[in-house]
Amino acid sequence: MSYEINRRLVAKRSPLETSAEVDSVTSGIIRGAFETICFETAIHLGRAASSAIINQSNERNGSIIDAHGRLAGISVGVPQLLFISPLAIRWGLEYYEEDDWGPGDVFLGNDPDHGGGHLPDYTVYAPCFDSAGKLVAIQALQAHQGDTGGKDPGGFSVDSLDIFHEGLPIPRLKLVHRGKRRGDVLDLLIRNNRLPSFTGDIAAMIGAAEHGANLLAELVERWDSDTVRAAMNFNIVETERRFRNEIEKWPDGCYEADVWIDHDTVGNEDVQVHVACTVAGDQLTVDMTGSDDRAELVNVWNTFSNSRGYAMAQLVSMVDPTIVKNEGLFNAVEMVIPEGTIVQPPPNKPAALGAFHPACEIGEAICIALSQIVPERSSPQVYKLGMPNAVIGFDDAGEMWMDQGVDVRASDASATEGVDGWGSMCSGLGNLILAQAEDAESRFPVINMSREMTCDSGGPGRWRGQPGTLNVKKVLEPTIAVAWMVSMKHPLRGLCGGEDASAYSNHFEVGTPNEYKIENSVRADLPAGAVCAYQYGGGAGFGSPFLRDPAAVREDVLDEYVSVEAARERYGVVLTGSAEECDIEVDVAATEQLRERLMAERG
């Protein structure tokens, strides 16, 4: 294994060979069919899977890759995962003849050093051939697995020193040959996974991939393979053209930003991500040179494909949203992802937690850099929690269960120009659904005691960030809890004069003499009845808070998003009356005087 693999996998692919010509109408129909197939296969997977992370939280996606390994179609999903899928399949394509690809085959890959994301994100894919036996496209599914067979249950280890501590890396593996399940291979996978639900999850992934390949075959039969190939070529070229047209509207120049992670999982502080975005005509270059390369860092190594995917997930949020998402995006952007750094680590580095951080800091840095030229489209599509509180236990039969902690919450939804931070999480998480309390409690021995928004936790701004939430959970049986805390020192940054989001905090064994705050990372044995209180940070603000409409601040106080004190100190709004009596009013004259004084004092 070497960096050469990444260089080879990311090399630009040529168009598919075809004698057909298509217009925008035909290519649009086929593109729509691709999106429908991806959506249907993802729904198929979600409904058939056994584990809550897939069938409730929707951490699954469908994508279509063409015969050259280019991203040809996606549907609603988790964008970062969708943009990762092509590289793992390109690795499989390099062994097309050796692995005897044919109709009815299904493959699996998850190896971070061979095009994958982190180990828990399995990519299962099935090829589609035309009547002449020539490969046309590949249906791919991505889904998060609750365990990967590593040294610690759950796949997230806060002290892993290499990828093998985390579990079983799979560069490529044939699961089904010509429609027949390979029982020996599936037994190997199931034996290397602690979760009994994995048996159902891998079966669901195989079934969904086969279903997608069958739908693709029907499409190819209806339109003929040459037309489908021509449509894929057309759509990729059109996406590149439209993306470049957007970039051409931006002023030329180099726009830079630095973002930091508080620390790695063992305490090495201020882990840096640097991004320089250079615009030259219709060419955008995203250069991550300058990102941290300290060899002693632990668990903050993001895989190459993840770095590429997270960068693109942020970029597409800053251009016309009607641009079709496919390989044309990557053709339009040059990415410099330096080898030997946290954004493209040396082989065999642990990758599970790096898919959170520095992955999210890449997107945040791009957003901050480009907010200098496209502020109206700048909102970081990231999450700043180190990791959810993963709670793990074993039943009387010794079978493992795991509450992933992907709970309903509000956090990290920053404001953008004209709009306050909204909803639960940023829109960049796509169709990820956060778990409801009732569902988690029906599956696991936990009680969700409260989930409530926290006053003054949204970053102030002309448009304020979404408040964060305090989630309190009790475990009813002795359990293992794994946590990694960041964004206490370096929360989400405000944009264009907006203030930063509030910090995160996390306490275990709350209300007992043993209560403690998680300052870094922990793998704790919790007794039955232990309570965990996780304060999620809010979103960051956009624009000066002294420009926020005082009437909006008044409404925020009435809604308990903002306190009377913060209204005065952070927004410069003087209120009269009582929040308890709901008769608060803005003192217009006093507000104007206070804002004038505060703006002079704070520059």
Predicted regions and their residues:
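Glycine/proline-enriched, intrinsically flexible loops and inter-domain linkers
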Residues: 2-103, 108-131, 135-285, 289-603
